[in-house]
Design a protein with these regions (language model features):
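Conserved serine/cysteine hydrolase catalytic core
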Residues: 171-233
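Gly/Ala-rich beta-loop-alpha elbow adjacent to hydrolase catalytic centers
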Residues: 73-82
Length: 316
């Protein structure tokens, strides 16, 4: 089996796989990279969340069948796609694995930790945020906020304008339907989370809450943050690549992985490691409070799940 895993990149809503090109150019000399083209961003309002998951699983399957392990890297909406696509590809806990490769890790970028059986918009009770609206006539989600402000406010104007020109349509069906195909794959593999402090699309406080929730629910989460917009793979590709190399080395859990991937020359001081410092009260508010809320949410979800299982057994 090849030693190095393949990276499978999943883009977010409205984005083509080419949004990762700059980042992939930095990574490909050391790791094989493939990017998923989401059917729900291909101009078909009938495309579904299941179609996106199937597209991601198809690429994962190609790699694992050839004996390669896989690390899934997903941005924004792509997080629920990437996490769901892990189903059936992680190593089994009882050791009865089939031959071939497996998904060995998940890296989320400005995204969230989804729940099994919960559609993308379910946590928002079906109400879209002010940044986009439901267009029932076309079947697409229409961006209302100026896209540069939403995604790329820290890019030079010319590059931001180009990136805006590359945005495409987003099927509503993927956002509101398909909950039966949503799967919390992040509970099956270790994960890394790359947060975005200056994000105007997904507030960093919400990101920190999501990390706290996942940890409370038993997930293994390494957390890093960058002082960027919603798209760090464009505004800070070298730092994003640095974190990815560090994560892959951890997923491989070997000296070989560390020697290959941790020698990247980048400025580590720009990478934030969120955590509490006893004599730095600001960290209590920046990190402690939102993560504590997340942990309470995670505990509530676990309690609800436990009561639901108990009720189901009692009603049989």
């Amino acid at each position: 089996m090849p030693n190095e895993p393949t990276l499978v990149f999943v883009p977010g809503s409205w984005h083509r796989p080419t949004c990762y090109d700059t980042l992939i150019e930095l990574i490909e000399p050391k790791l094989k990279c493939v990017a998923v083209s989401l059917p729900t961003t291909a101009g078909n309002p009938e495309a579904t969340f299941k179609d996106d998951v199937d597209a991601a699983q198809e690429l994962i399957s190609v790699e694992t069948r050839s004996g390669r392990d896989v690390v899934v890297i997903a941005h924004s909406y792509g997080g629920i796609v990437g996490s769901s696509a892990i189903k059936g590809f992680a190593k089994s806990k009882n050791g009865s694995d089939s031959e071939g490769g497996h998904v060995i890790g998940l890296i989320l970028i400005a995204s969230g930790y989804n729940l099994t059986g919960v559609a993308f918009m379910d946590p928002f009770f079906g109400h879209p945020p002010p940044s986009w609206r439901v267009n029932k006539e076309t079947g697409y989600a229409d961006i209302v906020t100026p896209p540069r402000e939403f995604f790329y406010h820290d890019l030079p104007q010319s590059e931001a304008e180009y990136r805006v020109s590359q945005l495409t349509t987003q099927s509503l069906k993927a956002l509101f339907e398909g909950r039966e195909y949503s799967y919390a794959g992040w509970r099956d593999v270790p994960s890394w989370y790359i947060g975005t402090v200056e994000d105007r699309g997904l507030p960093v406080l919400a990101q920190r809450m999501s990390v706290g929730m996942a940890r409370e629910m038993g997930a293994s989460v390494e957390h890093r943050e960058l002082q960027t917009s919603h798209s760090p793979f464009l505004s800070q590709p070298a730092l994003t690549a640095k974190i990815i190399f560090e994560a892959v080395a951890a997923f491989m859990d070997s000296d070989n992985g560390k020697s290959i991937f941790q020698s990247q020359e980048t400025e580590n001081s720009a990478i934030i490691r969120p955590g509490l410092a006893l004599f730095q009260p600001l960290t209590w508010f920046k990190f402690g409070i939102p993560m504590a809320f997340g942990r309470l949410l995670g505990r509530g979800i676990l309690l609800y799940s436990w009561v639901r299982r108990l009720w189901s057994r009692g009603s049989r």
